[in-house]
Swiss-Prot record:
E.C. number: 3.1.3.-
SMART domains (UniProt xref): DSPc
Keyword annotations of the record: Hydrolase, Nucleus, Protein phosphatase, RNA-binding
Protein name per Swiss-Prot or TrEMBL: RNA/RNP complex-1-interacting phosphatase
Subunit structure: Monomer. May interact with SFRS7 and SFRS9/SRP30C.
Region Disordered: start-end pairs: 1-28, 200-258
Record carries keyword Aminoacyl-tRNA synthetase: no
Length: 326
């Protein structure tokens, strides 16, 4: 029996006056979902873009018009950035938010069931890296993006993107976290995720170290100083309703047991006071400058639209056991 699927969570005796939490309905808006920007910006030097989970039409009755964020809205917002989405990696631990059929057929979709609050296990990390590497290998002659989301597009999403940049691209942990925070418009909140990333050792034999040499192209975004406040949220991992591990082949769920190819965006004016500012001023030539990381409050609120391509993405690796059905 697989503990992942059949484990049960017991509240035990409750000696407080609090009523037990109500079971969430299928059409309930995810908790705190409204607090986050729908879509971030492309992370310079990478193919990554992060966003919160889009919600299908049945949720719209409980949202104001300006709060709605559907798969179609996602497509439009990424097009507004003059970008093209090639792959969605869905990290939510449910199937209720939207259907794969709602996505354009030109976009690939991969679901990696990832439990919230706790640091993703090695199987989940391996699947994420493998999916990214395979996509990059198959799309090395174009500039399509990899969109990653969990519920809020922040903690699980930020952890796995940063983990890839650290382990595969050789970026320093603090640099990866800082880059993600700036481009997402929010900071990774969970302290256990941050601490786990900061313990990672940078591989010294990378051909292109993203945070030290030519792995990432220099940009106003990377040289701009930014003030980041990573406030802990529930420092330790919460007890999961489901425990144990799931084998790699069971983690990935796709339509018809294959990766369906499907295609997709962001309004930069939605950055608000209190969020991490978007990339720095456009129109300046930083080609001769070496980027660095430092801390300063009140970073620039300007945006830019330049694309950044990392040379390291021309050297993908992928295990022979992986299958990608077209």
């Amino acid at each position: 029996m697989n503990q992942w699927h059949y484990g049960r969570y017991s509240r035990g005796r409750d000696f407080t006056a609090r009523a037990p939490p109500k079971k969430k309905g299928k059409n309930q808006i995810p908790e705190r979902w409204k607090d986050y920007l729908p879509v971030g910006q492309r992370m310079p030097g990478t193919r990554f873009i992060a966003f919160k989970v889009p919600l299908q039409k049945k949720f719209e009755a409980k949202l104001m018009p300006e709060e709605c964020f559907s798969p179609l809205d996602l497509f439009n917002k990424i097009q507004e950035q003059n970008e093209e989405l090639g792959l969605i990696i869905d990290l939510t631990y449910t199937q209720r938010y939207y259907k794969v059929e709602d996505l354009p057929k030109t976009i690939s979709y991969i679901k990696i069931l990832t439990v919230g609050h706790q640091v993703p296990d090695s199987g989940t990390i391996f699947q994420f890296k493998s999916a990214v590497k395979e996509f990059l290998k198959r799309n090395k002659n174009n500039d399509k993006l990899i969109g990653v989301h969990c519920t809020h597009g922040l903690n699980r999403t930020g952890y796995l993107i940063c983990r890839y940049l650290i382990d595969v691209e050789g970026m320093r942990p603090d640099d990866a976290i800082e880059l993600f925070n700036r481009c997402r418009g929010h900071c990774i909140e969970r302290q256990n995720y941050i601490e786990n990333l900061q313990k990672r050792r940078v591989r010294k034999n990378q051909n292109a170290s993203a945070s030290r040499s030519g792995g990432l192209e220099d940009s106003a975004h990377l040289t701009e100083q930014v003030h980041t406040t990573n406030k802990p949220v529930n420092k330790g991992p919460k007890k999961s309703r489901r425990g144990g591990h799931l084998e790699s082949s069971q983690h990935v769920q796709t339509q018809s047991s294959a990766y369906s190819f499907r295609k997709w965006s962001q309004n930069q004016s939605v950055y608000q006071r209190g969020f991490v500012p978007p990339p720095g001023p456009a129109g300046e030539d930083y080609s001769q400058r070496r980027f660095f990381w430092s801390m300063r409050p009140n970073g620039s609120q300007a945006t830019h639209h330049k694309k950044w391509i990392a040379a390291s993405y021309q050297r993908p690796f992928y295990p022979a056991s992986w299958e990608w059905n077209v």
